[in-house]
Amino acid sequence: MRLFGNYLKVLVDSILYRDIVTRYQIRDDLALKETAYYAASNIGKKVSFTKLSQLLGLSNAITVKHYFSHLESVYLMFLIRRYDPSLKKQLANTKVMYGIDSALCRLIGFRPTDDEGRFLENIVFLELKRRQHEIFFHKGKKGCDFLLRNGTVITHAIQVSKQMSNPETRQRELAGLADALAHYPDAEGFILTEDEQATVNLNLSDERRVEIRIIPIWKWLLSR
């Protein structure tokens, strides 16, 4: 396992230096590496280019934006945008980070070993990307992990949660999904979990009632 971990770290360093530093003539290779490691440590979390540039001691947020663009170009890290009808607002808002491989993110990042929910979320993101969906996240009064858009229509709203047995967790996930579905009337609602399967009916208003499907992630992965 240690040899495999060392191999992955060498592989990442090789990609960073060969495919990014050399190709794009990056002067501060350490800042690029720290950006990649920061992203790996925070998969499924929001990032502000301005705040990260300050954390890394860089002069401006544009540099961090370029770093992430390079990381996406070599398929190491990915960003998704908060959905908004205004493209200008989409570009200005914070993004959410995901990685190309969960094992790689575990090894080069600094994540708590019990934070399995984020890695499940990363698995779902990668599958959505493999299926070539246009992916966003929702943030209104509550948040929803993924929105899928087809043309101009949001077709699916998806939450990812390792377990739904805790009442507070269940309420939070359902509330976030309900908030998303209230914004996008054409969307279907799903919650992907480790092992639960159920159907929940929610009243969004006096006129609208929606059905939410709770599905084990493994079953969803095999569904197409």
Task: Show the residue positions of the predicted features.
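Generic recognition of well-ordered alpha-helical segments
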Residues: A103, L107, G176-D179, I217-W220
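Conserved beta-strand segments of alpha/beta enzyme cores
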Residues: E134, E188, E211-R213
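Catalytic cores of nucleic-acid endonucleases
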Residues: K162-E207
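Structural motif
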Residues: T155-H156, E188
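Domain-level recognition of nuclease-like catalytic cores that cleave nucleotide substrates
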Residues: E196-R224
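Residues at the C-termini of beta-strands that transition into short coil/loop
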Residues: D101, K139, S161, T193, ...
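Flexible, glycine-rich phosphate/dinucleotide-binding loops
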Residues: S86, R106, N166, A198-T199, ...
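Accessory nucleic acid-recognition modules appended to NTPase machines
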Residues: R2-T155, K162
